């Protein structure tokens, strides 16, 4: 992104706040990407329709919370940065949030500290691909049928074992187990990041004026918080 365009975007982002058009577009693109990856996995087609919907709702924002900091680390940035140069943390440089220590702290945890964990881990491409597969087979969605949970659990266990064997071959038996633990902690960190992002949305809707938010955006926020989209 050219510097002058980046400055215009930064100014627009700070004026429009947390739920800006670029943010909403990014969420929609993320959902499409998430659906495409899920469809490419054989286990997804084995799930009944209601399980597919519940599963996608469960993993879509965890997927964003995992890939956001990974992409920033891959691009060499210290905070969430997409390939178009967009940085969500810039929102909180706005005077609107200047004295809101809670939002600033949450922003640091979600958008900056999460990247530091990926920088420390320095995942290989194989590890990243297998962790994505583990996220897409995580059987924790509310409303999943027992059969759906079993299918996803078996698939998740398969990818976990592949990741373990991969690291044991290249690092050693004990070191491979330790590396697996570090990798799984990145998924747990993504779950924490997703939780923080939802806290930020709930807090924002409660304590900040929504007068400039249209009905479509209001519904978008509610769907994000409740996972009903």
Task: Give residue ranges: language-model regions.
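Nuclear receptor C-terminal ligand-binding domain
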Residues: 1-229
